[in-house]
């Protein structure tokens, strides 16, 4: 598939593209939960205190998925708002979706640093995987926002046309 804008895509192609955009977000976001559960078990088995940080990561991930679902419903398909948003509204949407990711990354980095001497390498790699998945989710957010802005996106490309640094 070549680069497409929402206006250029046929109805079927648009539905496929939207499914891919959503899947590219949901897959890494859900995988974060699995890795957090694994890390939590390792920390508990090692009698390392981390309940607050783990709870913050889980809460942020839940918040992220909920916000994305609302944004997806409001901005795609028959529910899409017909009026064009301002650049500030797109920036706010991008910011609101990325804020929970920053918490996920930040708390994961804190736990990695706090327990790097107490955990096996595999547990530290799990923390790094959480961070990598958060960055992958961040890229999916960029593609989603670019798409609803009407910008061309390449469904086969992992980066968006408007890639920003982490907020």
Model-derived segments and their meaning:
Residues 69, 142:
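A short, exposed helix-loop element centered on a Lys and neighboring polar residues
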Residues 6, 10-20, 29-66, 78-88, ...:
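Histidine phosphotransfer helical core of two-component systems
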């Amino acid at each position: 598939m070549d680069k497409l804008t929402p206006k250029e895509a046929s109805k079927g192609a648009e539905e496929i593209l939207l499914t891919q955009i959503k899947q590219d977000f949901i897959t890494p976001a859900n995988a974060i939960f699995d890795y957090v559960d694994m890390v939590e078990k390792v920390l508990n088995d090692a009698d390392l205190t981390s309940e607050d940080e783990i709870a913050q990561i889980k809460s942020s991930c839940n918040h992220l998925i909920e916000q994305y679902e609302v944004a997806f419903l409001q901005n795609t398909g028959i529910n899409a708002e017909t009026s064009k948003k301002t650049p500030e509204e797109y920036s706010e949407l991008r910011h609101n979706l990325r804020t929970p990711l920053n918490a996920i990354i930040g708390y994961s980095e804190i736990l990695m640093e706090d327990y790097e001497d107490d955990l096996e390498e595999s547990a530290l790699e799990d923390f790094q995987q959480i961070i990598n998945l958060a960055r992958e989710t961040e890229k999916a957010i960029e593609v989603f926002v670019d798409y609803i802005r009407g910008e061309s996106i390449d469904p086969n490309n992992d980066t968006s046309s408007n890639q920003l640094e982490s907020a």
